[in-house]
């Protein structure tokens, strides 16, 4: 028999690791955008993206750019590759976060 609490914490750990991978990939994408597409880099607030004074609407602009797959028309294949990877990581992290919330709710009901 397995412990549901241990399973929950293992799932939380996997979710946190995937979030760290996602943010690391986002940093790599921003550094590539700085060199290959400075206009896009400025429009998504590249310098202030991970700061406390970052502009949320510009950060959401990058998320929409990736989720709507507008990067497919980009001239740099490295940007296309990184955006596709980032999109898949976002879907995975969102799914895992939803699963953690569902597990937490079910544990609260169960116990």
Curated annotation (Swiss-Prot):
Indicate how the chain sits in the lipid bilayer.
Multi-pass membrane protein
Keyword Cell membrane carried by entry: yes
Q: Which GO terms describe its cellular component?
A: plasma membrane
Pfam families reported for this sequence: UspB
InterPro entries, sorted: Universal_stress_protein_B (IPR019598)
Q: Where in the cell is it found?
A: Cell inner membrane
**Disulphide bond pairs:** none
Membrane-spanning segments: 1-21, 90-110
Q: Which UniProt keywords apply?
A: Cell inner membrane, Cell membrane, Membrane, Transmembrane, Transmembrane helix
Q: Which domain of life is it from?
A: Bacteria
Q: What protein family does this chain belong to?
A: Belongs to the universal stress protein B family.
* NCBIfam families recorded: PRK04960.1 (NF003435)
Protein name as catalogued: Universal stress protein B
What organism does this protein naturally occur in?
A: Photorhabdus laumondii subsp. laumondii (strain DSM 15139 / CIP 105565 / TT01) (Photorhabdus luminescens subsp. laumondii)
| Name of encoding gene | uspB
């Amino acid at each position: 028999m397995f412990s549901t609490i241990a399973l929950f914490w293992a799932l939380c750990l996997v979710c946190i690791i995937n979030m760290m991978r996602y943010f690391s990939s986002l940093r790599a994408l921003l550094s590539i955008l700085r060199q290959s597409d400075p206009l896009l880099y400025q429009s998504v607030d590249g310098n202030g993206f991970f700061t406390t004074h970052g502009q949320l609407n510009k950060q959401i602009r990058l998320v929409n750019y990736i989720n709507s797959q507008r990067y497919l028309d980009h001239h740099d294949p490295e940007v296309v590759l990184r955006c596709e990877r980032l999109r898949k990581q976002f879907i995975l992290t969102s799914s895992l976060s939803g699963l953690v919330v569902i597990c937490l709710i079910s544990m609260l009901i169960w116990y």
